[in-house]
């Protein structure tokens, strides 16, 4: 069989057309030109969710990307996360609105992020300088996924930042149907996700590794929802409220991920998962499927995901966050010392917190005053991004040790 030069040219043109570089300018428009030819991908939310879970996006570990995209080179996990986030958001848009116009989607998603984040920090005005919506969105998605290579190492990025990215998708779905109170909804979804993770870990046979992560989640809740003082199980009542099926499936998968991170499932963990699934209104077959899916995912990818190879996930999770916060404090030590010198009450309360528990009112003061400081120091903006609240307890724990001169005059006697 003979092939003409024109035949090879057609093959090359087709392959080249489906290529995409998610780190080069224009990648979102390229994604749009490809995805508009793939409308059969988005038939219902159930299949869309399953596809996203199979890539690892739901778990915060992006191992694959949609099959209609051919990367020009081996992609980093951040690059896969960018593609999967856009894929997840666009699929949600087409299913919720019955509109597949990509330009309209870009305008809507840009509007969504602006409404959701503009009250948190002034960083948007600095990063959204593109002349087109797609160019602006490229910068915004880069910020959502990477938060800057100077701030985050890849392991930290995949474990904490990307594991919360699916909340963006759930919020976007809510925003499309009812845009009011979207910030309150964001706070609630984060609160429920962290509560579920905490209680899933608490259902395990206690070991030091799991306790470190559980304590981290526990203390972070104070800053996510200041009127909740502890994990007393009241979050379960909110799960009984009328939540979307996609939210409920995500909550269950987060719990399964937490209990399976040590590659085993004990009776009490299984009991927690099935009890949670029942509260979420999910059928037993789906609960079993969720457990089996995370097991298969871990087995399939344990050799390629660094923190699944050797270390307990809780250890890696906590240690990488601590290293990263440590580095941020030291890099910004002079600016922080200046701010602390002007915030005597904050210094006093942080010193006090090293010896005894603060009251809810005191914790709220610490939160608000720290947020004001973070807003004034651009390189600390990560602490006020969605999901960044989980870092605050580590910051509060480390800063007296790393900047002792700022706390000497306010040392609390035991």
What spans do the regions from the language model cover?
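Small-residue-enriched hydrophobic alpha-helices in membranes
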Residues: 5-258, 267-379, 396-413
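DG-centered beta-turn motif at the end of beta-strands
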Residues: 262-263
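Transmembrane helix boundary and interhelical junction motifs in multipass membrane proteins
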Residues: 384-395
């Amino acid at each position: 069989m003979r092939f003409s030069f024109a035949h090879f040219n057609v093959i090359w043109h087709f392959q080249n057309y489906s290529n995409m570089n998610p780190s080069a300018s224009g990648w979102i428009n390229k994604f749009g030109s490809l995805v508009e030819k793939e409308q059969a991908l988005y038939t219902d939310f159930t299949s869309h969710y399953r596809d996203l879970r199979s890539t690892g996006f739901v778990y915060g570990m992006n191992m694959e990307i949609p099959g209609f995209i051919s990367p020009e080179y081996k992609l980093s996990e951040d690059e896969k996360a960018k593609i999967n986030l856009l894929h997840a958001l666009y699929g949600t848009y087409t299913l919720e609105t019955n509109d597949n116009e990509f330009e309209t989607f870009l305008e809507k998603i840009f509007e969504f992020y602006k409404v959701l984040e503009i009250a948190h920090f002034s960083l948007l005005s600095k990063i959204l300088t593109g002349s087109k919506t797609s160019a602006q969105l490229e910068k915004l998605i880069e910020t959502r996924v990477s938060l800057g290579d100077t701030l985050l190492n890849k392991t930290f990025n995949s474990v904490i930042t990307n594991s919360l990215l699916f909340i963006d998708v759930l919020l976007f779905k809510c925003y499309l149907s009812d845009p009011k109170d979207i910030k309150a909804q964001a706070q609630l979804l984060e609160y429920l996700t962290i509560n579920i993770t905490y209680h899933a870990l608490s259902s395990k046979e206690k070991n030091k590794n799991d306790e470190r992560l559980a304590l981290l989640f526990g203390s972070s809740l104070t800053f996510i929802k200041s009127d909740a003082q502890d994990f007393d199980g009241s979050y379960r009542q909110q799960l009984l409220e009328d939540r979307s099926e996609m939210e409920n499936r995500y909550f269950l998968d987060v719990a399964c991920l937490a209990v399976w991170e040590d590659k085993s499932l004990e009776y009490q963990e299984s009991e927690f998962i099935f009890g949670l699934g029942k509260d979420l209104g999910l059928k037993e077959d789906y609960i079993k499927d969720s457990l089996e899916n995370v097991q298969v995912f871990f087995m399939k990818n344990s050799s390629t995901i660094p923190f699944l190879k050797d270390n307990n996930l809780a250890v890696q999770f906590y240690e990488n966050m601590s290293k990263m916060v440590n580095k941020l404090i030291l890099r910004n030590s002079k600016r922080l010392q200046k701010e602390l010198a002007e915030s005597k009450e904050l210094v006093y309360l942080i010193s006090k917190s090293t010896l005894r528990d603060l009251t809810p009112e005191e914790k709220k003061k610490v939160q608000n005053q720290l947020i004001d400081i973070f807003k004034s120091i651009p390189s600390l903006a990560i602490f006020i991004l969605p999901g960044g609240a989980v870092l605050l307890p580590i910051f509060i724990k480390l800063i007296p040790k790393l900047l002792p001169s700022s706390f000497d005059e306010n040392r609390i006697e035991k």
